[in-house]
Amino acid sequence: MAAVTAALVKELRERTGLGMMECKKALVEAEGDIERAIDDLRKSGQAKAAKKAGRTAAEGAIAVAVSGDGKTAIMVEINSETDFVARDDNFLGFANKVAEAALAAAKTEAADIAGVELADGSTVEQAREALIQKIGENIQVRRAAILSAESALGAYVHGGKIGVLVALKGGDEALGRDVAMHVAAVAPQVVNPSEVPESDLEREKEIIRAQPDMAGKPAEIVEKMLGGRIQKFLKEISLVEQPFVKD
């Protein structure tokens, strides 16, 4: 059984929008398993679809660099201890230099990026250590992702905290940026409904069948309602089915 910590309760509150006591009770009953707690809350009708996990709570910034031909881009996350430092020009300058160097070297693993050489001849690791001495906070290159496109590539960073890269077949950079902006705002899980794993569909069906308004209904009615709700679920999580955020 995992410990029900304040951080776990906070995460569940952020993902469900429920109160502290409801979240704590759900986590205790789920023995500290946050995904199980979310499923139980949805089955009981207390919570709707929860936000997906995966966005780090650490402070920092995301920097993007795009190749000269516009066909390849990299996105790098650099973490700091405080938001104050994350907005510092020295920190942001370091993040942009790391992104440019990592793109040129085609490196995405933090350990590999550390050894990449910057324009001034120093390595990323040496520059990181110098920045730590200057700013007085721990700075970490956390992760990176690189993407290449056949036709056009879109990049979008929201508030320095959420970054998206989108590869298109056809279209142009403006369309790519619009799609990336939509992804940042709505966070689809897949591009097309057909990409949703069968295990995810079965889990969703189990949750829907357990909801209070399904109790006591004839099997054929339950199946009809289930079909409608699954279609709604697929539209909500699939990029091509979502209403465009700018409309």
Swiss-Prot record:
Could you state a single Gene Ontology molecular function term? translation elongation factor activity
Name the HAMAP family for this protein. EF_Ts (MF_00050)
Q: What is its main location?
A: cytoplasm
Q: Which GO terms describe its cellular component?
A: cytoplasm
Which family is this sequence assigned to? Belongs to the EF-Ts family.
Function as written in the Swiss-Prot or TrEMBL entry? Associates with the EF-Tu.GDP complex and induces the exchange of GDP to GTP. It remains bound to the aminoacyl-tRNA.EF-Tu.GTP complex up to the GTP hydrolysis stage on the ribosome.
Q: Which organism is it from?
A: Arthrospira platensis (Spirulina platensis)
What is the protein name for this chain? Elongation factor Ts
Q: Where is this region: Involved in Mg(2+) ion dislocation from EF-Tu?
A: 82-85
Q: Which Pfam families match?
A: EF_TS (PF00889)
Q: Where are the transmembrane segments?
A: none
Query: What are the leading ranks of the lineage?
Result: Bacteria, Bacillati, Cyanobacteriota, Cyanophyceae, Oscillatoriophycideae
Q: Gene encoding it?
A: tsf
Q: Gene3D superfamilies annotated for this entry?
A: 1.10.286.20, DNA helicase RuvA subunit, C-terminal domain (1.10.8.10), Elongation factor Ts, dimerisation domain (3.30.479.20)
What keywords is this UniProt entry annotated with?
Cytoplasm, Elongation factor, Protein biosynthesis
Query: Where is this gene product found?
Result: Cytoplasm
